[in-house]
Structure formats: C-alpha cells, structure tokens
C-alpha cells in the first residue's frame, strides 16, 4: 500500500465536538451517546448526537438572521473554498474597526484572530465584535466571506445584529468559532464546508487552512 501525505502544511482550525463544549448561554448543549455497541453484541458501533446548529465551528446561513434567508442546504459552496487572508486582531480593543485594518490587502475571504489562546473550556463573552462599517468596507474590497475565532461577529447582547445585517446586505457569508491559535498572519487556502441541512440556520464545519501552492 502506498502512503500519501500532502506536501503542503495543513492547519485544523475546527473545535473538537465533545461533552462540555462551551455553548451560547441557553442554547442546546452538545451530547453524544452510543446507541449500538459492539461490546453488547452489535456488529458495529453507532452513536447519536444532540447539539445546536451553532455548536463549535460553523457557518451561519442567511436564515439565521433573515426570515426569508437561504438555509444551510441552499448556500453556494465557492465562498467557503479558496484563498483567504488571516488577520491578527489581538491588539484591537472594543471592536474591529476599519481604522484597525490598514494592512488588509485584496482578498475574497478574511479570517480574524482575536484570542491569544482559544477558550476551549469556558464560555467567554468578552470577544471583539466586527463593526458593521468594517463589514461594509470589506464588501467594497470584494470580500465575500468573513471568519472569526469569536462565537459571533456581533456582541453577545446585541439586539440589532448590525454586523450580520451588513453581511446580509452584501450577500456575504460568515464562519464563527474558528481556532486560529497556531496560524500566523498571512494568506492560506481555506476549506470549510457547512453541513447541508434543510431548514438549517447554520451548518457545522470541519474547517482547515492549507499552505498555498507557492508558499515556502
């Protein structure tokens, strides 16, 4: 048998789904149980999961923030595949504003890192939201997907969802809950396909970054 390994480095930027996974306050906790067991005579092991559509790393569907928006089964896929720019926003305070981004170059997809270390074991509400004006500016630059290692592009207590609404206005897409701890600022290939869920307001992703072909 031949052994194949990609010559380009891969970063897994997904959260691990597990009991105890931090969740949005009041949302459905992640649960997993084995329903068929080989140690009980079944020829196979089979499990059952319960979770929110916004558990872990996920892509919001427009249905999440617009009553007539596309569901997760209807979203096009090209936004979630291709070259992206990872931006280190750890020095920013308050919210990610246009003034914080003078170094952003042209890119179809922009991912923001704000945590020094991703909070795998606790829910933190002190993340950096993305200003609606920043979304508007990114859209003018041709950006079609915004990603963040935060649980949301808006503040936890937001009632206006202004960043989400700006994304909707420009038919952009959102990835939330990324894990970017080990990823240096720069350009990568993104692959992060949300699950195809009818009536889904979001789809869980196994998101990865890969070195661009000419890197190194």
UniProtKB/Swiss-Prot annotation:
Record-level GO BP terms: anthranilate metabolic process; L-tryptophan catabolic process to kynurenine
Active site: 64 (proton donor/acceptor)
Entries under Gene3D superfamilies matching the protein: Putative cyclase
Sample GO molecular function, one term: arylformamidase activity
Keywords associated with the record: Hydrolase, Metal-binding, Tryptophan catabolism, Zinc
Residues that bind Zn(2+) 1: 54, 58, 60, 176
Top enzyme category: hydrolase
EC numbers, comma separated: 3.5.1.9
Functional pathway: Amino-acid degradation; L-tryptophan degradation via kynurenine pathway; L-kynurenine from L-tryptophan: step 2/2
Pfam families tied to this protein: Cyclase
Chain sites annotated for binding Zn(2+) 2: 60, 164, 176
Positions bound to substrate: 24
Catalytic activity, as annotated: N-formyl-L-kynurenine + H2O = L-kynurenine + formate + H(+)
Signal peptide start and end residues: none
Superkingdom to which the source organism belongs: Bacteria
Subunit structure: Homodimer.
Family that this chain belongs to: Belongs to the Cyclase 1 superfamily. KynB family.
HAMAP family linked to this entry: KynB (MF_01969)
Function text: Catalyzes the hydrolysis of N-formyl-L-kynurenine to L-kynurenine, the second step in the kynurenine pathway of tryptophan degradation.
UniProt name for this protein: Kynurenine formamidase
Organism for this UniProt entry: Erythrobacter litoralis (strain HTCC2594)
Organism lineage: Bacteria, Pseudomonadati, Pseudomonadota, Alphaproteobacteria, Sphingomonadales
Gene: kynB
């Amino acid at each position: 048998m031949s052994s194949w390994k990609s010559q380009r480095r891969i970063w897994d930027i997904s959260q691990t789904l597990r009991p105890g996974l931090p969740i949005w306050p009041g949302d459905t906790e992640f649960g997993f149980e084995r329903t068929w067991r080989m140690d009980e005579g079944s020829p196979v092991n089979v499990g059952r999961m319960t979770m929110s559509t916004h558990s872990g790393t996920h892509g919001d569907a427009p249905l999440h923030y617009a009553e007539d928006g596309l569901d997760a089964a209807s979203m096009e896929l090209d936004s979630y595949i291709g070259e992206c720019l990872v931006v280190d926003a750890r020095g920013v305070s308050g919210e990610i504003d246009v003034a914080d981004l003078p170094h952003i170059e042209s890119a179809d997809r922009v991912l923001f890192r704000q945590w020094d270390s991703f909070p795998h074991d606790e829910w933190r509400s002190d993340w950096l939201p993305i200003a609606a004006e920043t979304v508007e500016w990114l859209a003018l630059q041709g950006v079609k997907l915004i990603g963040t290692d935060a649980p949301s592009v808006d503040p936890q207590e937001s009632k206006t969802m202004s960043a989400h609404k700006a994304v909707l206005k420009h038919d952009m897409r959102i990835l939330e809950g990324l894990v970017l701890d080990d990823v240096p600022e720069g350009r990568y290939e993104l692959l992060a396909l949300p699950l195809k869920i009818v009536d889904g307001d979001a789809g869980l992703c196994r998101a990865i970054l890969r070195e661009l072909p000419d890197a190194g």
